[in-house]
Design a protein with these regions (language model features):
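N-terminal beta1-alpha1 cap of cysteine-dependent amidohydrolase-like domains
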Residues: 1-110, 120-128, 132-176, 182, ...
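The feature captures the ABC ATPase H-loop/switch
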Residues: 116
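Active-site-proximal beta-strand elements of phosphoester/diester hydrolases
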Residues: 216-219
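Conserved G/P- and acidic residue-centered "switch" motifs that form tight phosphate/ATP-binding loops
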Residues: 113
Length: 259
């Protein structure tokens, strides 16, 4: 059997401020191929080009990546202001219904940064436009200057629930992570379980309650140094295992239909 196919949800950019592209960080593809053991497939996040139904039938799982544009606040009942930054409505139109469909089908996904926020919004939650403006919260944004190593350096602790999903993945109730986000969870969706918190109370790790498939998602960026990092590697390994289990189940179902 071939490796599972993981659809990597892309972002839309203007290359050199004029050439439109669908792009995804190389670190995402490397983590999926080298740590999850799956085939990375970059997906154009535009409903004019591909449908959610087609993606569900073409892929065994999905990586909901980070990105500069934010989920539009209209998706959670709030009015857009400058504080919410830039948006990517085409990605919203793919990612949000994709999350809901995966939850119902038991198809695995792994949300990272914006992807983590998409999972919450898709399941009925809302977001703060700027975490650092809240009383008692730290600045979770990446440094404006410096090398990649400096931007992705370990910066804070995340405490996860004892006996919970992330404790089982990490084998520990405290881990150290990077942080490169401005927005964060305000209200958790009705089925969203906040399983990990930063020391300032910011939600950092979630999953969907009673979902039949893998839904673990994180606010930090585990794709950085994924093969060597003791926190990142088990996340991508667990996601790969879930994708293989889903692929195997689909293959068994197809054989039953054909027999």
């Amino acid at each position: 059997m071939t490796r599972p196919i993981i659809g990597i949800i892309s972002n839309s950019y203007l290359l050199n401020d004029q050439y439109p592209v669908h792009a995804g960080g190389a670190m995402n593809s490397e983590a999926i191929a080298q740590v999850s053991g799956c085939i990375p497939l970059l997906v154009p996040s535009d409903p004019a080009l591909v449908s959610v139904a087609e993606l569900l039938d073409s892929c065994d799982g999905f990586l909901l990546t980070g990105g500069r544009p934010n989920v539009h606040p209209e998706e959670y009942g709030e009015v857009a202001t400058e504080a919410y930054g830039d948006f990517d409505r085409a990605r919203d139109a793919i990612a949000l219904p994709l999350v809901r469909a995966c939850v119902e089908r038991g198809q695995p996904f792994f949300g990272v940064c914006r992807g983590f926020q998409e999972v919450n919004v898709a399941m009925g939650g809302s977001l703060y436009p700027e975490i650092r403006d809240l009383p008692g919260r730290m600045n979770h944004r990446m440094p404006p200057d410096g090398t990649m190593e400096e931007k992705f350096e370990i910066r804070h602790r995340v405490s996860v629930s004892e006996g919970g999903v992330f404790h089982k993945i990490f084998g520990a109730t405290e881990v150290m992570t990077n942080t490169l986000h401005g927005q964060g969870i305000k209200e958790a969706g009705p089925r969203i379980v906040i399983d990990g918190l930063a020391d300032d109370g910011t939600p950092e790790a979630i999953y969907v309650k009673d979902a039949p498939g893998f839904t673990a998602s994180v606010q930090w960026h585990p794709e950085w140094n994924a093969a060597a990092d003791l926190v990142s590697r088990p996340l991508f390994e667990a996601f790969g295992d879930a994708a293989r289990a889903y692929q195997s189940g689909q293959a068994r179902a197809a054989r039953r239909i054909a027999s």
